[in-house]
A protein has these predicted regions:
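Beta-strand-rich domain onsets/edges
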Residues: 1-20, 28
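Short hydrophobic alpha-helix segments
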Residues: 14, 22, 39-42, 53
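Beta-strand signatures of extracellular beta-sandwich domains
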Residues: 23-27, 63-65
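Short, acidic Ser/Thr/Gly-rich low-complexity loop/linker segments typical of extracellular
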Residues: 33-50
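Feature of secretome-associated and extracellular-like proteins
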Residues: 63-113
C-alpha cells in the first residue's frame, strides 16, 4: 500500500499564528529538467495543507511555491518576498511534511513529521 503523502504548514512568526489562506503551487521536475505544475492548494485556518495524496505522489524533485505576497498585502504588511520557492528531493517512499516559518523579511524551513 502506498502511504506517501506531501504536506505543509505555514506559521507566521511575526504574529505567532498560523498563516491561513495562502496559495501553494506544487511542481515536479520532469525528465527534460523543466518544472511541470501539478496543482495549487490553499492552507486552511490552521495553516496546514495536504499537497499530494497517496497515488498522486511519485518519487522526484518537487518545488513548492508559497504565494505569500497576497497574505501580507491583506494584512497591510510590506514583505521582501512576494513568493517563496522551496525545492525538495522526495525520493524515499515516505511521508514528506515541509513546514514554512515565515515573517515579512525572512523565512526558514525544515523536514517535519
Amino acid at each position: 500500500m502506498d502511504a506517501r503523502k506531501f504536506s505543509t504548514h505555514i506559521l507566521d512568526t511575526s504574529v505567532g499564528k498560523a498563516a491561513a489562506n495562502v496559495r501553494v503551487t506544487v511542481s515536479l521536475l520532469d525528465e527534460i529538467q523543466e518544472w511541470r505544475s501539478l496543482r495549487a492548494a490553499q492552507t486552511d485556518a490552521d495553516g496546514r495543507c495536504l499537497l499530494l495524496e497517496p497515488g498522486q505522489f511519485p518519487s522526484g524533485i518537487y518545488k513548492l511555491t508559497f504565494h505569500v505576497g497576497a497574505y501580507f498585502a491583506e494584512r497591510d504588511v510590506k514583505t521582501l518576498y512576494p513568493a517563496i520557492d522551496i525545492i525538495v528531493d522526495c525520493s524515499e517512499n515516505q511521508h514528506y511534511h515541509i513546514p514554512l516559518l515565515l515573517n515579512p523579511f525572512g523565512y526558514s524551513t525544515y523536514r517535519g513529521t
